[in-house]
């Protein structure tokens, strides 16, 4: 009997007995997607909405993000909430560099995403020019529900279940590096 048929038969027997097969990478991605720990980086009025996303009504803890970390070494998600001044940009980059891999960034609000409604010389026009952003949340300020939706989209991205507007599956972020496969 060929080796492939023997292995297929053994797998079928194990599956019929209730043994579950999966890759370790998918298991790690599933665990990571359900325990995203955000770093507090509130800069303006969007930070108030970010704080209200953890209250009893919105309950962000349903998605494993209930504990906002004060130390970047314990966080894997940075939520940039509000406008980023040019003097604060190097500090934000340093905080991002101190976060362990893998790490993700959510840009929350019009100021963080595009510099805000006013073209001010002292404000960075796009947080993406300082750190790589994974999810943009529109609004001025965005409601807590929008931030929770962004966390849910980030969970899908971490698990490799994210799709673009054309229905194409986006590449899964490798569990150990920032590179895409």
Swiss-Prot record:
Localisation: Cell membrane
Function: NDH-1 shuttles electrons from NADH, via FMN and iron-sulfur (Fe-S) centers, to quinones in the respiratory chain. The immediate electron acceptor for the enzyme in this species is believed to be a menaquinone. Couples the redox reaction to proton translocation (for every two electrons transferred, four hydrogen ions are translocated across the cytoplasmic membrane), and thus conserves the redox energy in a proton gradient.
Organism: Deinococcus radiodurans (strain ATCC 13939 / DSM 20539 / JCM 16871 / CCUG 27074 / LMG 4051 / NBRC 15346 / NCIMB 9279 / VKM B-1422 / R1)
GO MF annotation terms: 4 iron, 4 sulfur cluster binding; iron ion binding; NADH dehydrogenase (ubiquinone) activity; NADH:ubiquinone reductase (non-electrogenic) activity; quinone binding
Binding site for [4Fe-4S] cluster: 45-46, 111, 140
Cofactor note: Binds 1 [4Fe-4S] cluster.
Primary location: membrane
Record keywords, A-Z: 4Fe-4S, Cell membrane, Iron, Iron-sulfur, Membrane, Metal-binding, NAD, Quinone, Translocase, Transport
UniProt xrefs under Gene3D superfamilies: 3.40.50.12280
Swiss-Prot/TrEMBL catalytic activity: a quinone + NADH + 5 H(+)(in) = a quinol + NAD(+) + 4 H(+)(out)
EC number(s) per entry: 7.1.1.-
Protein name per UniProt: NADH-quinone oxidoreductase subunit B
Assembly notes: NDH-1 is composed of 15 different subunits. Subunits NuoB, C, D, E, F, and G constitute the peripheral sector of the complex.
């Amino acid at each position: 009997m060929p080796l492939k048929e023997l292995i297929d038969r053994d797998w079928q027997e194990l599956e019929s007995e209730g043994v579950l097969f999966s890759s370790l990478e998918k298991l790690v991605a599933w665990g990571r997607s359900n325990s995203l720990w955000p770093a507090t980086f509130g800069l303006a009025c969007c930070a108030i909405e970010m704080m209200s996303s953890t209250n009893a009504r919105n309950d962000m803890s349903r998605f494993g993000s209930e504990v906002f970390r004060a130390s970047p070494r314990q966080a894997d998600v940075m939520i940039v909430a509000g406008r980023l001044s040019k003097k604060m940009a190097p500090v934000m980059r340093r905080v991002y560099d101190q976060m362990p891999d893998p790490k993700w960034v959510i840009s929350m609000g019009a100021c963080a995403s595009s510099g805000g409604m006013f073209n001010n010389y002292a404000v960075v026009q796009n947080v993406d020019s300082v750190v790589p952003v994974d999810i943009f949340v529109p609004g001025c300020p965005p409601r807590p529900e929008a931030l929770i939706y962004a966390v849910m989209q980030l969970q899908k991205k971490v698990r490799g279940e994210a799709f673009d507007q054309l229905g194409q599956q986006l590449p899964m972020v490798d569990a150990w590096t920032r590179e895409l496969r």
